[in-house]
Amino acid sequence: MRLIALPAFDDNYIWALIAADGRAIIVDPGQAEPVLAAAQHQGLVPSAVLLTHHHGDHIGGVAELQQRWPDLELFGPADERIPADAHQVGHGERLRLLDVEFQVLQVPGHTRSHIAFVADGYLFSGDTLFSLGCGRMFEGTAPQMFDSLQRLASLPGETLVCCGHEYTLANAAFALHVDPTNAALQRRQQEAQAMRHAARPTLPISLKSELATNPFLRTGRPEIRAAVAPRAAGELSSEVDVFAELRRWKDEFRS
């Protein structure tokens, strides 16, 4: 299997995991056009679509893809805002698609029903875990999002994170504001700048690298707590408190 990132909108990625015969599993097709173009120019033939959550920039292309490939199978979370013909999958379930086993993880926070998929060494994290960041909490709570990130952080370090947006440079600016002496983070920013200058995706990225540089996965570190503490209205009695304040800070941050 090979993996390609299909850029969509301004900063989205649609992920395609492609078998040797061209059949492909598509993750979060917010637009149909990038998938249709890949089918035309690269011989890609979608056989299944995986949906992490209901937002339009992740599911907006589904109907057009179904028109082109009527036998396309859909899999997504149990949520009335997901296309009704999708197979509903939940935490711990396993799917076998194109001889690859996908594990479903429940990761609420960004939305109440958000899920992630793990397969073949890849983590398709949607808008839960980003490169050097995490998603906004539109429907979930800080404890939910913290637990979801911890669940993803427990995966093997060599797992490659395939998230839904190209946010690395924007997230690096905030991460360095919080953790300015982190040498690994400084290197990642420089590498990401070079990659974007060359019009290359900064993804996927190893979970090991994220654990060393992403402040939202480092809320137990004393330097992160120390950076957050002056902003907190009350005592930071747990990592969840640190995370919640860090997320509020990110929401307000302007580089």
Curated annotation (Swiss-Prot):
Instruction: Report if keyword Cytoplasm is assigned.
Output: no
Query: Where Zn(2+) 1 is bound, by residue?
Result: H53, H55, H110, D127
Q: In which pathway does it act?
A: Secondary metabolite metabolism; methylglyoxal degradation; (R)-lactate from methylglyoxal: step 2/2
Q: What reaction is this protein's catalytic activity? A: an S-(2-hydroxyacyl)glutathione + H2O = a 2-hydroxy carboxylate + glutathione + H(+)
Which segments does the entry list as coiled coil?
A: none
**An example Gene Ontology biological process:** methylglyoxal catabolic process to D-lactate via S-lactoyl-glutathione
Q: Which UniProt keywords apply?
A: Hydrolase, Metal-binding, Zinc
Q: Which InterPro entries does this one have?
A: Clx_II_MBL, Glyoxalase_II_hydrolase, HAGH_C, Hydroxyacylglutathione_Hdrlase, Metallo-B-lactamas, RibonucZ/Hydroxyglut_hydro
What NCBIfam families does its record include? GSH_gloB
Name the UniProt record assigns to this protein: Hydroxyacylglutathione hydrolase
